[in-house]
UniProtKB/Swiss-Prot annotation:
Transmembrane segments: none
Biological processes per GO annotation: 'de novo' CTP biosynthetic process; UDP biosynthetic process
Name by which UniProt lists this protein: Uridylate kinase
Positions of ATP binding: 9-12, 52, 56, 159, 165, 168
Record gene name: pyrH
Reaction(s) this enzyme catalyzes, per UniProt: UMP + ATP = UDP + ADP
Keywords, in A-Z order: ATP-binding, Cytoplasm, Kinase, Nucleotide-binding, Pyrimidine biosynthesis, Transferase
Subcellular location: Cytoplasm
Main location: cytoplasm
InterPro entries membership: AceGlu_kinase-like_sf, Asp/Glu/Uridylate_kinase, Uridylate_kinase, Uridylate_kinase_bac
Family: Belongs to the UMP kinase family.
Activity-regulation annotation: Inhibited by UTP.
GO molecular function: ATP binding; UMP kinase activity
Pathway annotation from the record: Pyrimidine metabolism; CTP biosynthesis via de novo pathway; UDP from UMP (UMPK route): step 1/1
């Protein structure tokens, strides 16, 4: 396998499937199947999930809610998603641990880097919830931060499009996809890969990012085997 340890970033919206809100059990089971394929081959897997299918702090702030309060609500939404994914993975026989940046000891371990790494070394899947534990930071930033901390080989950002394009492919049929692109070119072209904080953290730590279509069966396995899927962002 090309990658021994990965950090998989999933958006909360991805868990909605065809719904307008919440969690689609069918989509959850599909993702669990995809993850199981690489888990069974010995890939060490850490996961960060967003919470946008339940609540997004910045959206609450735009409607008059206190931003800090909204962000904490969003963190709790990621914990709900993490619990849902944990249940789906364990139903398929995979040992998992949910670690949260906020202490919620009845349902999750507190995030401790050394403990997370030990779990990964024992082939347990580790799901990181509650973002960074601080307001004003996105789950993309949390994903890169945790990826750097646990020494992941790569950040795999699963989305509903098959890579990075020069313009939005859902709005422009003439959009051109990049197979490989440098961090510098992403910034120069103003491409929307991750928020600036997350992206800069990844660049500074030379942690590559692969943006790919998580909804296409087999993509996750192909990437871990070294096939050219999605767009690779590298130094």
């Amino acid at each position: 396998m090309k990658y021994k340890r990965i950090l998989l970033k999933l958006s909360g919206e991805a868990l909605m499937g065809d719904r307008q809100y919440g969690i689609d059990p069918k989509r959850l089971a599909e993702y669990a199947d995809e993850i199981k394929q690489i888990h069974d081959l010995g890939v060490q897997i850490a996961i960060v999930i967003g919470g946008g299918n339940i609540f997004r702090g910045i959206a609450g702030a735009s409607n008059g809610m206190d931003r800090v309060q909204g962000d904490y609500m969003g963190m709790l939404a990621t914990v709900i998603n993490g619990m849902a994914l944990q249940g789906a993975l364990e139903e398929k026989g995979m040992l998992t641990r949910l670690q949260t940046a906020l202490k919620i000891e009845a349902i999750a371990e507190p995030y401790i880097k050394r403990r997370a790494v030990r779990h990964l070394e024992k082939n347990r899947i580790v799901i990181f919830g509650a973002g960074t534990g601080n307001p004003y930071f996105t789950t993309d930033t949390a994903a890169v931060l945790r990826g750097v901390e646990v020494d992941a080989d790569v950040i795999l950002k699963g989305t509903r499009v098959d890579g990075i394009y020069n313009v939005d492919p859902e709005k422009n049929k003439d959009a051109v996809k990049f197979d490989n692109i440098s961090f510098e070119d992403v910034l120069k072209k103003g491409l929307n890969v991750m928020d600036t904080t997350a992206f800069t953290l990844s660049q500074e730590n030379k942690l590559p990012i692969i943006v790919f279509d998580m909804n296409k069966e087999g993509n996750l396995l192909k990437i871990c085997k070294g096939e050219n899927i999605g767009t690779v962002v590298n130094i």
